[in-house]
């Protein structure tokens, strides 16, 4: 007698959701960007990694077997010529650009007192997190508009929708990424181009460690961070991973999201939908 389980596809038989697509991932050499690159390749995409971390980018290409479907290009997202060159390199190598992932970002130095915040540090965060995203959108659009299709995805944060989760520059920059996402989606919709962003809750990466309060730190900062994040999470019993964020990006890049644009996809376990101060449902 047949059962429902007999109709469930094994992981090996699941469709490659990005087969034949060409993607460019900024900040793709490490952290969330690396996870996105790995999952894109798993789903059949050809990928160009754009990063300032040359050694790590080359290492990742070698990890993926040195395939002709993976490439690295040095790119500082604050320099428009670098981004233009990375986009053109991708098109020259793979023939087109279907997916642009603006992942490169920094959190900036912790600074609990606005009176002490150095403007040079503020400017650096905005240069990378906002200017870099805008330049990526601009040059992706340059290729995608004539093709009348494409998907632009930017990595934002839960700090895109609420305050008190990070330094002023970081929070302001992530609000700006959300604003750019909505506005660019409004312009590019007529060209068949989708523009979205992904806003995860805290993930254990070197970038995120800067957000851990000094009072919560011991000798093992990674464990401290994971414990702090778990204690403040809304969804319990599940730890957010870089792969979870990458899965959200794959969804937005795929045809499964073909009518999704202007969206801020929250990968936060309901964190931003909860008033943590009231704690109405806490025992």
From Swiss-Prot:
It comes from the Eukaryota. GO terms for cellular component: cytosol. Keywords: NAD, Oxidoreductase. It catalyses: (1R,2S,4R)-borneol + NAD(+) = (1R,4R)-camphor + NADH + H(+). GO terms for molecular function: (+)-borneol dehydrogenase activity; xanthoxin dehydrogenase (NAD+) activity. NAD(+) binds at residues 27-33, 51, 76-77, 103-105, 170, 174, 205. Its EC number is 1.1.1.198. One of its GO terms (biological process) is abscisic acid biosynthetic process. Belongs to the short-chain dehydrogenases/reductases (SDR) family. Involved in the biosynthesis of monoterpene natural products related to camphor. Catalayzes the oxidation of (+)-borneol to (+)-camphor. Shows absolute selectivity towards (+)-borneol. Catalyzes the oxidation of (+)-isoborneol to (-)-camphor. Shows absolute selectivity towards (+)-isoborneol. This is (+)-borneol dehydrogenase 2. It comes from Salvia officinalis (Sage).
